[in-house]
Amino acid sequence: MAQFYSAKRRVTTREIITVTTDGLDAFGQGVARHHGKALFIAGLLPGERAEVVLSEDKKQFARGDVKKRLSESPERETPRCPHFGVCGGCQQQHASVALQQRSKAQALCRMMKREVDEVISGPAWGYRRRARLSLNFTPRKPGLQMGFRKAGSNDLVDVHRCPVLVPRLEALLPKLRDCLSSLDGVRHLGHVELVDVTSGPLMVLRHLKPLSAADREKLECFSHSEGVALYLAPQSDTLEHLNGEMPWYESDGLRLTFSPRDFIQVNDAVNQQMVARALEWLEIQPGERVLDLFCGMGNFTLPLARRAESVVGVEGVAALVEKGDYNAGLNALKNVTFFQHNLEEDVTRQPWAQQGFDKVLLDPARAGAAGVMQHIVKLKPRRVVYVSCNPATLMRDSETLLAAGYRTVRLAMLDMFPHTGHLESMALFERD
């Protein structure tokens, strides 16, 4: 959710106030009222009373730090992760999953001015199938640090456990740490990316200087013994495949291959449900043509092609368009065409834009889809499904559809990232 702030107003006094929170924002901050404005307090849950020290005071809102909690919510939980509160990855492990989902759904409801019809969720723990861990070596203790950044800082939190990772990746952490620590070039490592999909786990190791033959041999031994596909990244845009098959995952009975650097949804369980719900909402009929904008490598496009007469996918990243074409052939889908085009530019003269479509699906990045909304209206599709990772731009873009006579038929909150402040959603719009 987008928030816009002016320059900080320094608090010159360390006044202690006592407040009771009456809500939780989508980021997991407690919300109270102080002098008629919102007071945001990290770590405090709805209904909890606390002594708070103001850390920031502005015209429309303020922020405070808990000095002493005076009461405890029944929805407060003990965080599972020993790094919670320091690591910047999660913000809400202290709140029950039900409270997290309810607060996010309420935030979405306020922004869209409509009740949320459902919350689409999966396991709250062990859901994250992709992670990037920073690496830093110091000659003295602790030696190799491997982990995530602190909240609001570039400092590294040395992570030994991460309960939001899928179990196979979390179990890999200590063995991976031992392997990397043993390398002669350990001081020249940048980060390691871990991915776990249907084909198995993989790792991408970014190294800043060439690795010795001995180090490469150690990494290959680790790859074979742990069953982990291995890629090296000597440059930020270069990959060297040392071991293991090309990664792939299953979706809607299809096999989707991808490069380790390609975007895939982090939460497989919610992604599967999201695709199924989009197909259900669109109600594809025989003979219909469907347009999929911001299509990536075909996460929605290919399942749509199994049902529609024909599907067009449009994506700005050339590598993803190539992967979409490859996956269409791999799955023997001959009724789908992919186009590369920057959807932030004028689309009206593009070949695909001259065609007619019965239904449209779009899944833009956080910036939304302002550049194509008017063209979608001109196409006059009967139904539009908008998948969003930013409710602020969903709200903005939906105004174009509503002004053109569409109505919001369904609204769902996607709990894609439990225990974090990320709020994702999807909406169905229909034209009478």
Swiss-Prot record:
UniProt record similarity statement: Belongs to the class I-like SAM-binding methyltransferase superfamily. RNA M5U methyltransferase family. RlmD subfamily.
Q: Name one GO molecular function term.
A: RNA binding
Family matches, as HAMAP family: 23SrRNA_methyltr_RlmD
Gene encoding this polypeptide?
rlmD
Q: What is this protein called?
A: 23S rRNA (uracil(1939)-C(5))-methyltransferase RlmD
Which species does the entry assign this protein to?
Cronobacter sakazakii (strain ATCC BAA-894) (Enterobacter sakazakii)
Q: Mind telling me which residue stretches traverse the membrane in this protein?
A: none
Q: Which InterPro entries match?
A: 23S_rRNA_MeTrfase_RlmD (IPR001566), MeTrfase_TrmA_AS (IPR030390), MeTrfase_TrmA_CS (IPR030391), NA-bd_OB-fold (IPR012340), SAM-dependent_MTases_sf (IPR029063), TRAM_dom (IPR002792), U5_MeTrfase_fam (IPR010280)
Q: Which reaction does it catalyse?
A: uridine(1939) in 23S rRNA + S-adenosyl-L-methionine = 5-methyluridine(1939) in 23S rRNA + S-adenosyl-L-homocysteine + H(+)
